[in-house]
């Protein structure tokens, strides 16, 4: 059975390979340090049969954004700088790609961000897509490209709340 849990030293970070050296290195060398320092939180997708093997991971953090770069129609709605959530990284192991693991983790990340938004103010979620394929993946969840920055994407918190309620994910854990 698949589950998502916080990254710990017990997880086998060295064996993880998503095909992107920068993401592999982050998980292996930096993620636990950033958790310890309170910079970000990394969550891993594991199977209960082999709970130390990482099938995928995502990292969440907070950020401060310059709102003049927001997509048309959003830039003028906020002060010059505003707080937001950042999906800093999302990766799936090569042997698990194209099996819905990314969508599973994205849904979990959005759920966690919604919980945060109930307690602190954020205008939405930001993500830096690595390439056009990644951008296409995020756009299916409603992300919009920033003005003049086609690989930097934004999902307004109101859009996330509305989509979540319409899909009735509230009953999932």
Could you tell me what each predicted segment is?
Residues 1-33, 37, 42, 53:
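Short amphipathic alpha-helix that is part of the acyltransferase structural core
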Residues 53, 57-89:
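Conserved acyl-donor/pantetheine-binding loop and adjacent beta-alpha core of acyl/acetyltransferases
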Residues 88-98:
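A short, internal acetyl-CoA/4′-phosphopantetheine-binding micro-motif in the GNAT/acyltransferase core
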Residues 98-112:
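Conserved acetyl-CoA-binding loop-helix of GNAT-fold acetyltransferases
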Residues 106, 131-134, 150-157:
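Short glycine/proline-centered loop/turn elements that form peptide/ligand docking sites
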Residues 114, 120-122, 128-148:
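Conserved active-site alpha-helix within GNAT-family acetyltransferase domains
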């Amino acid at each position: 059975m698949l589950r998502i849990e916080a990254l710990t030293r017990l997880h086998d970070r060295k064996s993880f390979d998503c095909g992107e050296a920068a993401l592999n290195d982050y998980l292996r060398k930096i993620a636990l340090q950033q958790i310890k320092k309170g910079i970000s939180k990394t969550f891993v997708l594991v199977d209960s049969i082999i709970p130390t093997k990482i099938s995928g991971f995502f990292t969440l953090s907070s950020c401060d954004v310059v709102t003049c770069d927001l997509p048309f129609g959003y830039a003028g709605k906020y002060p010059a700088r505003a707080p937001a959530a950042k999906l800093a990284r999302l990766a799936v192991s090569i042997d698990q790609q194209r099996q819905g693991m990314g969508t599973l983790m994205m849904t979990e990340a959005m759920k966690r961000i919604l919980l945060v938004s109930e307690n602190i103010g954020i205008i939405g979620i930001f993500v830096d897509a690595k390439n056009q394929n990644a951008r296409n993946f995020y756009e299916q969840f409603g992300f919009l490209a920033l003005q003049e920055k086609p690989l930097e994407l934004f999902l307004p918190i109101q859009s996330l709340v509305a989509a979540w309620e319409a899909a009735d994910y509230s009953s999932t854990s």
